[in-house]
């Protein structure tokens, strides 16, 4: 009996030691990446070396941040206290949620490594521990902090998506990205971003977002976090609520904009959203999600692509129950592009490229101020305010490469193309067709924002085109 108890004690001791050493399953990641030059889209930037963190999950995979592996030409991973590097590649990446899964070519890499279990959303005031490989050293680092709030925030990686995140005062520094945030030997988050100018403020991606990502890739394809295609606004005014015959004083938010075809099919502007996916919607547009008051959009984004979300709305003095389809917007020009090289068309020294957030970011840190109201309106707002005038792919004259054929042009770039040879330009294909199908003696290019037009001699432009490409080292006149 004594022998049995000793063995049982040793077994339990080993389990405790193993559970208390999650760092063995935390991986150091080295990337060698090369981003395009969005202002000169035929070029690429210099190769950049960076480090990040990750951790082992079920299925012999490594979870990390999407931004850690974006534009990576080569990825190397290294185990805890092991100097040997191993080649890895991206299996799945979700830029909208800033998560990625890596696979390692050497199957022996995972021998002896225990997958870290994914826990639940931590409560405010919980103590959490971050583990990773921050910049400034080679060894693993541990920091502790307290969960201060849970809310939807803008994810820096896509730039235009707000998903659930947890704020903590645990240090999350460059290199920590992708590492696990632990509580009670379970992963309660993936470290991913801080706030410039604020000390002791870091954010991690919580289990609901992680589990959504993992469920999404079960069919071997990542779709993303869907949207309902609506915009909510508060409905606080008691007089207006009385006018609408709403009885509950704090239930229901106004649907003030419909941004997708599916939303327009089922809903009307000025409908009142009472409930979404079982969550009552407060007058201030929030819902109570696992004990946290967060924006009601989470009721739709936590659904899977092409699923239907049950909703209750108030319309014409009565309650309606509907099922609202939600979809991922694959043509979202507002979201940062992380793998596909930018499109361009080069003709007579004129470089054309689509208007996108990535293109505007090439203007510098204060890109929104440099871009001006006209370009911001075209990119962000026109499709909602003037859908009939919205372009599927607005085209920019990015720059003009100097040559005698274009020497007299006064407009030298960073302007929106409105039409070419009298044909409205809604996409890059429209632009190319307008140039190549034109038989007149001159090309007339009209620009947006009432900037006027420029004119090119067609025969001279055609003769000069190849020479200009060779002079500036451009191998192809287009990339689509």
Question: Across the structure, where does each feature detected by a protein language model lie?
Answer:
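Bacterial N-terminal signal peptides
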Residues: 6-15
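Beta-strand/loop subdomains of soluble extracytoplasmic proteins
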Residues: 71-75, 80-89, 123-129, 140-153, ...
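Terminal peptide-recognition signature
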Residues: 27-29, 54, 60, 64, ...
